[in-house]
UniProtKB/Swiss-Prot annotation:
Biased composition (Polar residues): 356-372
InterPro entries (UniProt xref): AH/BAR_dom_sf, AH_dom, Islet_autoAg_Ica1/Ica1-like, Islet_autoAg_Ica1_C
UniProt cross-references to PROSITE patterns, sorted A to Z: AH
Protein source organism: Mus musculus
Source organism superkingdom: Eukaryota
A GO term, aspect molecular function: protein domain specific binding
Gene name, Swiss-Prot/TrEMBL: Ica1l
GO CC term, one of those recorded: acrosomal vesicle
Protein name: Islet cell autoantigen 1-like protein
């Protein structure tokens, strides 16, 4: 009866111990998940382990990235080899139609490009092997190390949880009265066991990470050596072929190509042209403004002139030009001219009166008579010109002989009768 009760008490204590252990472990997980600050001495004791874990994560990430890069590299090699082969075939096809030296050059270059494309595809073999080895390394070595790391993390969580449990039990411990001494010994024993398990796994993790890094270096050095050897052979063969083509085409006649790079002027030239156009436009605008101002001044001056002067054309009002144009009339209209006396002698027997009657009407000619008379005579226009000339400070001779002026109009109109100028129809009949 006593033995059964003792076993039952031990079972109850073991259940309580497991519950307490799970409680403190869960508390440690919560502290780690929330990022709360832990004991600095405990964290410092795991500094070497944390460094190894960083190396492991770096190896894991770089291996995954290397697999992706090798896949993309293979795709790019296939594409560039295909394009290079197409270019070589095109050059060979065009060389068959061209019998000149250019055709020979295209044929040689096309063969070299096709050969280079085939040799470039040889790089895919070491790359495929590298990809396979890296994938195997990730699936086996890294996965095995990751399993060990996960076990170590669980052991570390239990160990740190046991430390929290022991810290809590030490606060209730009273060595003098032996209170809670048994409980503290149990917790201390639990901490010791969890520490042993954690230290063992910690050592395994550090060794596996070191071995993982070394094995990766050996794998890459072996695989990349094969790739490097293949790549160097490819470039040596390609360079040799291109050198032979260059030597074979050394004596060919070179071709000079001129390419039109730009179809329009540079922005600087366009700016200069626009500036010149604006300058010319401004000069033209200035000239037009000057002409407009001069015209306005002419109109204002013309409005200030007398009415008789405005009745004449503007060109006739200029003194120098008027005298030059009608200088021959001065000799004809002078009182000493012989033509005036001859006209007077002829006119006296015919008209019965001196010809001075014709000239006596001269002062009455003006703008008013021009507007009121029903018959406009050229002599009146001439008299008007004489009056206008007098308005510009020219002497007015009242007894000028008009015969020369009549003869002038007779020459202009041969069919008209010069004797009828200045006489009415009755006077002509009486004559």
């Amino acid at each position: 009866m006593d033995s059964s009760e003792q076993l039952r008490a031990e079972d109850n204590q073991s259940v309580v111990s497991r519950m307490q252990k799970n409680y403190w472990r869960t508390k440690q997980v919560f502290i780690k998940a929330t990022g709360k600050k832990e004991d600095e001495h405990v964290v410092a004791s795991d500094a070497e382990l944390d460094a190894k874990l960083e190396v492991f994560h770096s190896i894991q990430e770089t291996c995954n990235e290397l697999v992706k890069i090798v896949e993309k590299y293979q795709l790019r090699l296939n594409v560039i080899s295909e394009e290079e082969n197409e270019l070589g075939l095109f050059l060979k096809f065009q060389a068959e139609r061209d019998s000149t030296q250019a055709g020979e050059m295209m044929d040689a270059a096309g063969k070299a490009l096709c050969s280079s494309a085939k040799q470039r595809l040889a790089l895919c073999t070491p790359l495929s092997r590298l990809k396979q080895e890296v994938a195997t390394f990730s699936q086996r070595a890294i996965s095995d190390t990751l399993v060990t790391i996960n076990r170590m993390e669980r052991a570390r969580t239990e160990y740190r949880g046991a430390l929290l449990w022991m810290k809590d039990a030490s606060q209730e411990l009273d060595p003098d009265t032996f209170k809670q001494m048994e409980k503290f010994r149990k917790v201390q024993n639990q901490v010791r066991n969890s520490k042993d398990s954690f230290d063992k796994l910690k050592k395994d993790v550090c060794q596996k990470v070191d071995l993982l890094g070394a094995s990766r270096c050996n794998m890459l050095s072996h695989s990349l050596t094969t790739y490097q050897r293949t790549l160097l052979g490819f470039w040596e063969k390609t360079a040799q072929m291109m050198t032979q083509i260059q030597e074979a085409c050394a004596g060919f006649h070179p071709y000079d190509f001129l390419a039109l790079k730009r179809l329009q002027d540079t922005p600087g030239n366009l700016t200069a042209d626009c500036t010149e156009g604006q300058t010319e436009g401004s000069c033209l605008t200035t000239d037009l403004n000057k002409v407009a101002l001069s015209e306005e001044e002419e109109e204002e001056r013309f409005e200030r002139e007398p009415a008789v002067a405005r009745a004449l054309p503007r060109d006739s009002l200029e003194g120098d030009d008027f005298e030059k144009e009608f200088s021959f009339l001065n000799s004809l209209l002078s009182p000493t001219s012989s033509s005036a006396s001859e006209f007077t002698q002829e006119c006296q027997p015919a008209c019965g009166s001196p010809c001075t009657g014709l000239t006596s009407q001269e002062p009455s000619v003006g703008p008013g008579s021009l507007t009121s008379s029903s018959q406009f005579l050229p002599s009146q226009l001439f008299d008007l010109g004489l009056h206008a000339d007098g308005a510009f400070n020219t002497p007015n001779n009242g007894n000028q002989d008009m015969s020369a002026w009549f003869n002038l109009f007779a020459d202009l109109g041969p069919l008209s009768n010069p004797d009828a100028i200045g006489h009415s129809d009755d006077e002509l009949l009486n004559a």
